[in-house]
Amino acid sequence: MNAHKERLESNLLELLQEALASLNDSELNSLSVTRVECSKGKHHAFVFVLSQDHKILSKLKKAEGLIRQFVLQASGWFKCPKLSFVLDNSLEKQLRLDAIFNEIAKGKDND
């Protein structure tokens, strides 16, 4: 990945956290953005949020305009990528893998 894209994604992640914190919705205020992945042309960004509630995605979709407006004002950028919000299940996957490794380790201890 090139340095420019990494910097853009990092800046966008910080701005999105600030944008969510500035909204008047307590559910959206408490969300954590775990990572941002921009497309090659940087016209589109996938925003991964940490939540178990699928309903939060519809709230984020409704607030996308306000979030993009905040990002534009705070960054001074000419354009803001279109945002697609995705539930981040990487933590859940990591917990499952840890449980599997623990079972394997217990099996070796019993041998």
From Swiss-Prot:
Keyword Metal-binding: no
InterPro entries: KH_dom-like_a/b, RbfA, RbfA_dom_sf, Ribosome-bd_factorA_CS
Gene Ontology process terms (BP): maturation of SSU-rRNA
UniProt keyword annotation of Cytoplasm present: yes
Pfam families: RBFA
Keywords: Cytoplasm, Ribosome biogenesis
GO cellular component, one term: cytoplasm
Protein localization: Cytoplasm
Family that this chain belongs to: Belongs to the RbfA family.
Biological function: One of several proteins that assist in the late maturation steps of the functional core of the 30S ribosomal subunit. Associates with free 30S ribosomal subunits (but not with 30S subunits that are part of 70S ribosomes or polysomes). Required for efficient processing of 16S rRNA. May interact with the 5'-terminal helix region of 16S rRNA.
Subunit comment: Monomer. Binds 30S ribosomal subunits, but not 50S ribosomal subunits or 70S ribosomes.
Protein known as: Ribosome-binding factor A
Organism: Helicobacter pylori (strain Shi470)
